[in-house]
């Protein structure tokens, strides 16, 4: 045994428990197997590593080559799939080693054969002739034997034998015996077959030798035989082949975003025997690497799958790997991937107020104002809400030159993980001063997601440097003195400013310290200005202060120097002002003396400022010019030293810049000539200022220059030191000669400042070949010139910083042909100092032009730097996005539509634009804004508005003018650009409509909100703008009150072919029917007016309150004896229903739902409605009085109801907050609630419309006295009624009659009614003993006397007895004689108890005055409300289909029947029912059947019949039905029978008693139990005369052997009400209903002789008293004589005969013999051929019968009912009438021919008679015979008339009418019963099925007619009753 290593499974391998059995022990004939060949060497016994693969085995039952002789289901044992290792290289004598790892048992739960696979770790474990790689061996377990499915040989060689071992293992717990057959072919063989015996767990190795002879595949089978059947093992040898497999067979790639890439890997294994070349074939968007390759046997390659989708769909494709010879074999893998669109939400981090980040709008990222040259950073947030990675790219709109991009985003691309956020920085680095930069940043997710355009805006600000003063006046200074004044310079901006004054302080009389510097933001620096003149002269110099990134500032320095001999005029700032004015007017070229002379000669004049001007000769002359504003840059560059100047200079010097070059010495260089030229008309003196040690000087130092003359001078240079750099700016002042003496100035306005001349000279003293020192500097050079329009100069400032510790000289020289101007072009920069250089150019052309200049440092050519800048002339152009065409959508006439139009400014200048629409189109077209400013690189969207005037198509041409922004409003732009735009629009007409023309809210609860949606439709092709109006129709709207219907919006717009939804919210405030009309008008954008109103739809609503009603009431327990009618009054249900029908008051709606709102014991009452719920009275400790109320939601909305006790309305408070003292009322309520005297179940509920619910009210009689409890009955959002629960508990054996009220109202009776109805007044005995009542009728007599001795009130039974718990009916007759109200107070005495005075009240009315409003039948609302109710008690399984029957108004002596059903809803319980007889004081009520059984889930019909008496009266009865469970009754009868048997046994059994034994006095209950014990004797109970309702206060004698008691029955109560009217009054008021009622007349009953004698015996003594024998004998004699006389009297006999014969009616005198014959023949046609005796009297009688006497006019069920009964009766009558009509039609068709034949025969006879009359006179014999025939015919006719009279008399008999009514009633009952069972559908349409026609012989005889045809011809005759005479 050895341990397996190198396993791939996680589970630990198991050791083999049972060792293998040696093959030699079972098979001694091993040498036969070798067959003379050498035994193969045994494999080395080293422990080889074995790999266990986790590939699942196939789940098939058995391999195809396996055959079983028996059903495998009975013999194959299911086993788990395990992985085993088979050692096939060892000897046949060695035991096989098996590794059994633990694998999940569920992997092969459905497999009949276990699969086992194994694979060695390497091919080194196999023998020489074994395959290089062993395959997995699938094993199975069959009949307890574990064996491989097949043995597979691979890698074999021809002619060599290869052995594989077949391992069999016994997996069962019993000894296994089997046999096997050798393979059939000669290529596979094994040892000689012998029986195999395997013990449990033992393994057997069977060697199988394969010896091939040909290179082909071999297959065979090795069969095993067991007692259970046979099975086989496949033997297969295959050739080397190509085989590649993919693991796994399918590959699910991760979810990927569109445009992104994801990858996955799988293995491609070469499980074949040959090296295999493969090629992959796949489809987009999948890629596979490597796509081709070569795999050696056993080698695996990892394939990479790349997925890059282009659309968001689910991909499921198959990749195919082609391999093998000719690439004909293939292996495939299923690739599955899901592509989703990535989504990026862009937001701004750390938002500023100027930012815009709203959804649906342009996002704006505002950087604010950033200093030039600085960088600002803002961040945006990218959120990926999708489930995939979101790759993105960020692009900033590319400019034509990258150097001009002020915005940058280092994050050009990236990925945002699912659900995460990423922040991206955007930088703003402005380079152009005072410009607003706009750019657009596009954030583009990969794939199909839409990009987000982010607008970035920033403003570049520069320094804001200013001087304290712009003029420093030193006044006059003596020669040799020095004057100094302070001056501060300030930077008002927050960015750093570099400044420098353009003056050489060493060589100038004016000095500024410091001359250069740096100002940080918001800083100020003090400058020191000094004046030290060298000559007595007027000194004035305008010094420029150069500022980097700002226009230069100019500082005027002035001072006058006086000497002892020379005192020039003092220069003042006013002189400068006048000078500049004179410069603009051209007067500066004249010296002051000439100006004085001209002023004196009036050739010049002075203006209001004192400046000189040429006098104005004419008003039309132009005014004198003023000094213009000159931009600082222009003044700096064009100051007269160059070819271009603003004003001509008065004096100039050339050259202004001199370069001496290298002057190493020792000889001085040649001086450079200078030319000084005077352009004025006066003599000028020029003086050069020079310090003594300056290496540069000019000779002569001073000189005078005549007017318009020039002077030559020389510039000298003498470097004092070798190898040095020298640069200097020489200064000279030129002044008019006359100004040297102030006395020469007569007019101060002619004063003129001096002019300052400068010459910049440079040179160095470096020897040739000596290297100049290396400069260290930085040069801030922008790449682009600022944007300017055509013809305008553009300027830039450069900053040169000397970072070295030595001096730095520079010189700037533009490239040849370059048109840039540099100032200064040379200079000296001190160590650490900076030099500001200004550059100017005039751009030309719209394309970028490069400007190149060279910077040379330290006068060395090797330190030359080329600098390039670009400029262009900015074009005035815009880019239009719509290709100069714009289309409007179709627009409604009168309305407007808009269309956006976007254009972009590609230039770097802000442009002004203006749209110009012609005057005729301004009513149709409008644009907003029509003019405006568009910043550089900005996109601007305009809105065009199209307003058509008519239904047509429009075409417009509109122009847009563009010019440079920044011009004054009145200035005309120098250049403009013109664009034309084409606009197309269509005007249409349309209208709105509503999807529903009538919108009904239905029923809505008052004060509640309900919403409906109104769908508007726009079926047109244009957008409509509408406004809705709401008008209330009913009820009328009240001013200043909001409407009950609100619209969520009243205005809106609808696109074409669309619909819009308006939410309507209704909140009615009162109960009413609301109606509204919604109209609309279309809005016009032109004049902002609404069009004509048009109706849109109608809205209706019914505002209701919840409506609850009480349908029925029933009682149980102690209240069981109270009638339902009386109970209805006790609970004031009529008044309660009337209250519930009314609207609630506002106080009742204070709390719309049940709420705890009170802190007191008695909560406040918010309702004015109060009612009594009187539970009646019952004795102490009697069963509770239980009342069931049937509640119904009679409304149309759902409702919630609740009974709230005082405790339910009270807020729970702490004990310390409770009220300390309670009054008697509170204490009483607490006692009632704590003891639960009144209980309600359930206390609350919800009811849907039409739903009913039963509520149980219970009152427990636990305390003697009267109990009260206020209960609030609350209907949510409805009524709130206070119910006063009242209950009375009576002491035992106390008399008590419960009077509900002291007043009683009789039913109103019409006056003149001779037979007023009987009315009922009920008295209920609530005590436990019988009571006797007595009505005192004396007061009734008094009322009678007052009313003309007419009995207004009459009590029919003024005295009677009331049993405990029952109700007595006191009958009254109220008979008014006047239309008024009668009242009487009648005392009712309860004998032995109290008396009560009852106030009776009756109303008499005149029926002729009231008409139809006369209340003929108004018992109570219980009469109608409970007709269709069904009050179901909890636990009740049987119920009535109707709990109340209201017959309404009926005539007296009528019989009314109703069919009802008894339903058993139980599924397994049979119920027996028994109706209790309910006797009435008048009339009769019966139920049929009285008893019966209702099967489970069955229905039993029964009929309730009321037979009204002859008296007009009110009927009110409660019919009680007792219900018994059949199962309990059987048990009861069984126990009763056992009890009777035991009773009989005890009666025959006797006991011998030992008299000597003392009577036991101890308790028998303590005796020990004995096996047998004689039962005590049964004693007869004494009849109890006490009431049965008495409780257990009276001890009862214990029954020795109690008799089983029957089970307590369930009770069902059926109420019946009716009002019987006298026949005359019923006909007068209900004439149309009279035929619907059947008048039941009782038949005279014949008594038996015995009964008659008994009756006579009973009545005679009471009526006559005792009679003597003499009187009896006398009476007999007298009567005998009289009777004998009558028998002998003939006159008496004749009189009797005449009285029996009916008198001849008056119409008999019109008798005609011929008509009689004709009628006789006509009536006998139908019956004579069939019946032997003519009986046409039946038909005659039927035809003469009055309509009201026919059977169909006496329906058995009385008045037609509602519902199914009424429909059933009507349809049954229709069916009967149709059948009768069909029968009559058939009879007419059958007898038609016969009638025609009879008529022809009769006509022939008549003709014969007439002809006979004309002929000769007959003989007397013929006349006698004719007379005899006539006599016979007359006798027949008389006989027929007598029979007809008899039939008519029979029909008028009550018995016949009763029989007809019984038959019809039975038929209708059968139909309704069948309909209730579903056998007949009464509501279906009637169908008439015509019978097939048949031929009837012309002559009908009884023999020719079949029996069925006879039945069709004859009418059925109703049999008569047998009791008729």
Curated annotation (Swiss-Prot):
InterPro entries: CFAP65, Ig-like_fold, Ig_CFAP65_10th, MSP_dom
A Gene Ontology term for the protein's cellular component: sperm flagellum
Keywords for this protein: Cell membrane, Cell projection, Cilium, Cilium biogenesis/degradation, Coiled coil, Cytoplasm, Cytoplasmic vesicle, Disease variant, Flagellum, Membrane, Transmembrane, Transmembrane helix
Keyword Transcription: no
Bilayer topology annotation: Single-pass membrane protein; Single-pass type I membrane protein
Basic and acidic residues bias spans: 1649-1661, 1739-1762
Subcellular location field: Cell projection, Cilium, Flagellum membrane; Cytoplasmic vesicle, Secretory vesicle, Acrosome membrane; Cytoplasm
Record GO biological process: flagellated sperm motility; sperm axoneme assembly
Coiled coil: 1525-1550
Domain MSP: 877-986
Signal sequence coordinates: none
Region (Disordered): 1645-1667, 1736-1823
Annotated transmembrane regions: 188-208
Main location: membrane
Alphabetized GO MF terms: RNA binding
Subunit description: Interacts with CFAP47.
Family designation: Belongs to the CFAP65 family.
Involvement in disorder: Spermatogenic failure 40: An autosomal recessive infertility disorder characterized by severely reduced or absent sperm motility, due to multiple morphologic anomalies such as absent, short, bent, coiled and irregular-caliber tails. Patient spermatozoa may also show morphologic defects of the sperm head.
Protein name in the entry: Cilia- and flagella-associated protein 65
Lineage start: Eukaryota, Metazoa, Chordata, Craniata, Vertebrata
Gene transcribed to yield this protein: CFAP65
């Amino acid at each position: 045994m050895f341990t397996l290593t190198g396993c791939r499974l996680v589970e630990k391998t198991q050791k083999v428990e049972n060792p293998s059995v040696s093959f030699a022990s079972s098979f001694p004939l091993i040498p036969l197997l070798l067959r003379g060949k050498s035994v193969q060497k045994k494999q080395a016994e080293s422990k080889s590593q074995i790999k266990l693969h986790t590939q699942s085995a196939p789940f098939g039952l058995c391999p195809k080559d396996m055959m079983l002789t028996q059903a495998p289901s009975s013999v194959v044992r299911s086993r788990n799939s395990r992985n085993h290792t088979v050692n096939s290289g060892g000897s046949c004598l060695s035991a096989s080693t098996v590794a059994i790892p633990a694998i999940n048992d569920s992997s092969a739960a459905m497999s009949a054969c276990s699969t086992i696979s194994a694979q060695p770790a390497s091919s080194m474990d196999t023998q020489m002739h074994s395959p290089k790689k062993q395959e997995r061996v699938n094993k199975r377990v069959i009949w307890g034997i574990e064996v491989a499915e097949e043995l597979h040989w691979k890698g074999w060689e021809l002619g060599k034998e290869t052995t594989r071992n077949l391992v069999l293992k016994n997996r069962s717990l019993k000894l296994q015996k089997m046999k096997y057959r050798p393979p059939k072919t000669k290529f596979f063989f094994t040892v000689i077959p012998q029986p195999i015996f395997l013990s449990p767990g033992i393994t057997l190795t069977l060697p199988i030798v394969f010896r091939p002879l040909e290179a082909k595949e071999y297959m065979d089978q090795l069969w095993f035989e067991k007692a259970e059947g046979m099975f086989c093992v496949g033997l297969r040898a295959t050739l080397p082949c190509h085989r590649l497999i993919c693991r796994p067979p399918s590959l699910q790639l991760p979810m990927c975003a569109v445009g992104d890439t994801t990858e996955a890997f799988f293995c491609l294994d070469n499980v074949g025997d040959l090296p295999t070349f493969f090629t992959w074939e796949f489809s987009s968007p999948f890629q596979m690497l490597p796509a081709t390759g070569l795999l050696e046997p056993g080698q695996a390659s990892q394939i990479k799958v790349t997925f890059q989708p282009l659309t968001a769909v689910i991909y499921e494709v198959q990749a195919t790997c082609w391999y093998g010879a000719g690439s004909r074999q293939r292996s495939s893998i299923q690739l599955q991937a899901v592509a989703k669109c990535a989504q990026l939400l862009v937001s701004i981090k750390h938002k500023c107020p100027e930012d815009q980040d709203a959804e649906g709008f342009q996002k704006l990222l505002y950087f604010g104002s950033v200093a030039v040259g600085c960088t600002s950073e803002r961040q945006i947030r990218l959120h990926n809400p999708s489930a995939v990675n979101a790759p993105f790219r960020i692009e900033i709109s590319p400019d034509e030159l990258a150097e001009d991009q002020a915005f940058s985003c280092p994050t050009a691309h990236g990925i945002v993980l699912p659900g995460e956020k990423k922040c991206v920085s955007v930088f703003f680095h402005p380079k152009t001063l005072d410009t607003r930069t706009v750019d657009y940043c596009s954030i583009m997710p990969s794939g199909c997601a839409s990009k987000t355009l982010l607008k970035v805006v920033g403003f570049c600000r520069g320094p804001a440097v200013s001087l304290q003063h712009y003029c420093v006046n030193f006044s006059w200074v003596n020669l040799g003195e020095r004057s100094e004044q302070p001056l501060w310079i300030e930077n008002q901006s927050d960015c750093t400013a570099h400044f420098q004054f353009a003056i050489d302080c060493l060589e100038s009389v004016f000095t500024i310290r410091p001359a250069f510097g740096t100002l940080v933001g918001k800083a100020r620096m003090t400058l020191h200005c000094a004046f030290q003149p060298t000559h007595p002269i007027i000194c004035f110099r305008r010094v420029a202060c150069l500022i980097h990134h700002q226009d230069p500032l100019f500082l005027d320095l002035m001072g006058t120097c006086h000497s002892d001999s020379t005192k020039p005029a003092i220069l003042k700032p006013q002189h400068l002002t006048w000078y500049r004015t004179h410069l603009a007017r051209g007067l500066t070229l004249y010296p002051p003396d000439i100006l004085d002379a001209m002023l004196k000669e009036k050739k010049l004049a002075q203006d209001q400022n004192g400046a000189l001007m040429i006098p104005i000769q004419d008003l039309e002359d132009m005014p004198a010019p003023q000094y213009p504003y000159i931009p600082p840059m222009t003044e700096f560059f064009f100051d007269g030293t160059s070819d271009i100047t603003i004003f001509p200079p008065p004096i100039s010097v050339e050259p202004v810049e001199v370069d001496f070059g290298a002057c190493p010495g020792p000889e001085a260089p040649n001086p450079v000539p200078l030319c000084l030229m005077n352009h004025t008309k006066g003599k000028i003196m020029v003086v050069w200022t020079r310090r003594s040690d300056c290496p540069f000087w000019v000779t002569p130092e001073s000189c005078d220059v005549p007017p318009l003359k020039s002077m030559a001078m020389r510039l000298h240079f003498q470097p004092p030191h070798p190898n040095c750099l020298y640069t200097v700016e020489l200064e000279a002042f030129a002044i008019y000669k006359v100004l040297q003496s102030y006395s020469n100035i007569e007019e101060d306005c002619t004063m003129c400042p001096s002019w300052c001349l400068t010459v910049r000279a440079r040179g160095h003293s470096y020897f040739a070949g000596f290297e100049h020192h290396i400069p260290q500097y930085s040069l801030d050079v922008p790449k682009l010139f600022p944007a300017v329009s055509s013809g305008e100069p553009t300027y830039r400032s450069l900053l040169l910083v000397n970072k070295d510790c030595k001096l730095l000289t520079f010189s700037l020289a533009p490239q040849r042909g370059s048109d840039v101007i540099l100032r200064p072009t040379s200079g000296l920069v001190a160590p650490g100092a900076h030099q500001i250089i200004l550059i100017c150019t005039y751009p030309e052309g719209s394309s970028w032009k490069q400007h190149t200049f060279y910077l040379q440092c330290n006068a060395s050519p090797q330190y030359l730097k080329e600098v390039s800048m670009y400029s262009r002339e900015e074009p005035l152009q815009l880019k239009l996005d719509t290709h100069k065409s714009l289309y409007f959508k179709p627009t409604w006439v009168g309305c407007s539509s808009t269309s956006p139009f976007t254009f972009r400014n590609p230039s770097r200048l802000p442009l002004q634009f203006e749209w110009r629409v012609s005057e005729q189109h301004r009513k149709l077209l409008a644009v907003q804004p029509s003019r405006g400013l568009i910043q550089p690189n900005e996109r601007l969207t305009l809105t065009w508005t199209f307003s058509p005037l008519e239904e047509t198509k429009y075409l417009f041409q509109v122009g847009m003018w563009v010019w440079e922004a920044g011009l004054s409003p009145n200035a005309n732009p120098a250049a403009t650009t013109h664009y034309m735009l084409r606009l197309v629009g269509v005007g249409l007409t349309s209208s709105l409509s509503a999807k529903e023309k009538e919108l009904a809210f239905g029923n809505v609860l008052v004060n509640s909100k309900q919403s409906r949606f109104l769908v508007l439709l726009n079926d047109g092709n244009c957008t409509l703008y509408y406004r809705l109006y709401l008008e209330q129709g009913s009820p009328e709207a009240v001013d200043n009150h909001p409407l009950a219907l609100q619209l969520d919006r009243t205005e809106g717009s609808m696109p074409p072919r669309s619909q819009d939804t308006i939410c309507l919210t209704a909140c009615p405030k009162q109960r009413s029917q609301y109606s509204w009309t919604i109209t609309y008008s279309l809005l016009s954008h032109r004049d902002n007016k609404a069009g004509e109103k048009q109706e849109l739809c109608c809205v209706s609503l019914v505002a209701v309150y919840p409506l609850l009603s009480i349908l029925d009431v029933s009682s149980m327990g102690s209240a069981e004896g109270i009638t339902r009618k009386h109970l209805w009054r006790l609970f004031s249900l009529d008044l309660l229903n009337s209250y519930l029908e009314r609207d609630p008051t506002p106080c009742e709606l204070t709390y719309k739902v049940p709420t705890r709102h009170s802190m007191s014991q008695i909560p406040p009452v918010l309702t004015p409605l109060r009612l009594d719920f009187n539970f009646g009275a019952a004795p102490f400790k009697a069963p509770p009085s239980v009342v069931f109320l049937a509640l119904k939601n009679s409304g149309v909305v759902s409702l919630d109801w609740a009974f709230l006790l005082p405790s339910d309305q009270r807020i729970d408070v702490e004990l310390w907050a409770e009220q300390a003292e309670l009054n008697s009322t509170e204490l009483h309520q607490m006692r009632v609630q704590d003891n639960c005297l009144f209980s309600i179940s359930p206390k609350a509920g919800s009811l849907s419309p039409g739903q009913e619910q039963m509520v149980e009210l219970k009152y427990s009689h636990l305390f003697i006295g009267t109990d009260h409890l206020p209960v609030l009955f609350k209907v949510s959002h409805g009524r709130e009624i206070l119910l006063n629960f009242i209950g009375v508990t009576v002491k035992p054996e106390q008399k008590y009659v419960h009077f509900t009220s002291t007043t009683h109202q009789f039913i109103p009776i019409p006056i003149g009614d001779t037979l007023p109805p009987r009315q009922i007044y009920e008295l209920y005995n609530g005590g436990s003993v019988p009571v006797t009542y007595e009505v005192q009728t004396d007061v009734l007599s008094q009322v009678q006397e007052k009313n003309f001795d007419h009995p207004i009130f009459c009590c029919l039974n003024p005295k009677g007895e009331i049993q405990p718990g029952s109700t007595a009916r006191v009958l009254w007759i109220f008979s008014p004689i006047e239309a008024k109200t009668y009242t009487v107070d009648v005392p009712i005495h309860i004998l032995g108890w109290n008396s009560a005075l009852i106030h009776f009240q009756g109303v008499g009315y005149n029926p002729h005055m009231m008409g139809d409003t006369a209340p003929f039948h108004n018992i109570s609302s219980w009469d109608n409300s409970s007709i269709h109710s069904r009050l179901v008690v909890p636990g009740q399984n049987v119920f009535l289909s109707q709990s109340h029957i209201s017959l309404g108004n009926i005539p007296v002596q009528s019989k009314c029947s109703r069919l009802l059903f008894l339903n058993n809803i139980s599924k397994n319980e049979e119920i027996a029912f028994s109706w209790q007889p309910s006797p009435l004081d008048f009339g009769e009520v019966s139920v049929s059947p009285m008893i019966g059984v209702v099967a489970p889930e069955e229905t039993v019909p029964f009929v309730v019949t009321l037979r009204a008496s002859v008296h007009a009266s009110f009927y009110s009865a409660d019919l009680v039905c007792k219900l018994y469970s059949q199962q309990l009754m059987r048990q009861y009868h069984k126990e009763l029978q056992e009890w009777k048997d035991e009773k009989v046994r005890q009666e025959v059994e006797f006991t011998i008693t030992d008299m000597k034994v003392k009577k036991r006095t101890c308790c028998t209950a303590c005796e020990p139990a004995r096996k047998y014990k004689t039962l005590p004797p049964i004693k007869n109970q004494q009849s109890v005369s006490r009431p049965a309702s008495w409780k257990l206060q009276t001890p009862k004698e214990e029954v020795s052997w109690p008799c089983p008691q029957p089970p307590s029955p369930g009770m069902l109560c059926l109420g019946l009400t009716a009002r019987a009217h006298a026949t005359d009054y019923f006909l007068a008021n209900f004439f149309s209903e009279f035929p619907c009622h059947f008048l039941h007349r009782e038949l005279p009953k014949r008594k038996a002789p015995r009964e008659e004698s008994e009756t006579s015996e009973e009545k005679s003594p009471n009526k006559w008293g005792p009679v003597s024998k003499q009187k009896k004998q006398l009476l007999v004699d007298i009567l005998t004589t009289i009777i004998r006389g009558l028998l002998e009297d003939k006159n008496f006999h004749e009189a009797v005969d005449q009285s029996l014969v009916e008198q001849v009616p008056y119409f008999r005198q019109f008798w005609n013999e011929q008509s009689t014959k004709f009628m006789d023949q006509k009536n006998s046609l139908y019956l004579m051929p069939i019946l032997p005796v003519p009986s046409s009297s039946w038909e005659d009688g039927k035809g003469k019968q009055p309509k009201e006497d026919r059977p169909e006019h006496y329906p058995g069920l009385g008045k037609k009912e509602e519902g199914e009964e009424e429909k059933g009766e009507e349809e049954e009558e229709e069916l009967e009438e149709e059948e009768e009509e069909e029968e009559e039609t058939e009879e007419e068709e059958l007898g038609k021919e016969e009638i025609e034949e009879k008529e022809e025969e009769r006509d022939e006879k008549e003709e014969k008679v007439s002809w006979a009359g004309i002929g000769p006179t007959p003989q007397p014999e013929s006349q006698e015979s004719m007379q005899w025939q006539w006599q016979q015919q007359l006798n027949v006719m008389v006989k027929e008339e007598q029979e007809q009279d008899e039939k008519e008399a029979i029909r008028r008999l009550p018995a016949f009418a009763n029989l007809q009514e019984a038959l019809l009633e039975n038929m209708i009952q059968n139909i309704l019963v069948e309909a209730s069972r579903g056998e007949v559908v009464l509501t279906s349409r009637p169908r008439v099925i015509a019978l097939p026609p048949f031929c009837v012989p012309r002559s009908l005889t009884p023999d020719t007619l079949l029996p069925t045809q006879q039945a069709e011809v004859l009418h059925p005759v109703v049999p008569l009753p047998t009791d008729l005479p």
